[in-house]
Structures are given as structure tokens and as C-alpha cells.
Amino acid sequence: MINLRNAPPSILAAAMLIAVGAVFNFAMGLLLSLAPQLLAGIATPTTPSGAPAQLLLISGVACIIFGFVFVWIIKELFNKSHLAIVMIYTLSIINMLFGLFRLPLGLVTIFLNFLVIFLVRSESAKRWLSSN
């Protein structure tokens, strides 16, 4: 059983932001993989031979997998695992780099990932993560 009674607000806020990311990934994954008719107005990518690629389905499955990864990170964060911190840093940096490709909307992604890193690196979070 995970005891969050002593968790600092910075850890809870970081977990909440990661949970929002997980929900967003699950929603986008379901939209892309199960409801492609809703995206009928979007040009479907094709392979060089002209056959339609299953890029939307693959993107949807990848989003769902990332949603599960985010849930796993939250669980590990509440268990005070150092692997969770490494995963948070790694995925935040990757998300920020991909946010650069989507400017100006990517600025929101970059800001939220900086916020998660800032929250996890706070003094109260470091003390809580180092305690047994």
C-alpha cells in the first residue's frame, strides 16, 4: 500500500501533471486507433508505393503505450524509486525536444515539462525521496 500522507505538495503536483499527460495519451491513442473515421478530413499518409500506411493506428498504439508508461512512472514515484526520477527526466527532455518541432503550441509542452522537472527537483521532494 502506498502511503501518500507525508508526500510533499511538489510530488503530488508532479504526479498530477503526469496523470494529466497519461489521460491525454490514452484519449489520443483511442481516438487515433479506434476512431479513424473521426479523422476523415486529415490526409492519410501513404507509403512510396501509394498504399495507405497504418500510421494513425501505430500512432494510437504508441500513445496508449506512453499512457501506461506514465501510470507506471506515477506508481514508481510514489514508491520513492530513483528509476522514476530518471524516467521523469528522460521523458521530459524528450517531450521538450519534440515540443520544439510544434512551436508555438509546443511552448505549452515545454513549460509543463520544465514545471514537472522543477517540482521533482525541489528540496521537499528530494528530502521525501531520500527518506525510507
Residue ranges and their predicted role:
Residues 1-132:
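Topology signature of small-to-medium multi-pass alpha-helical membrane proteins
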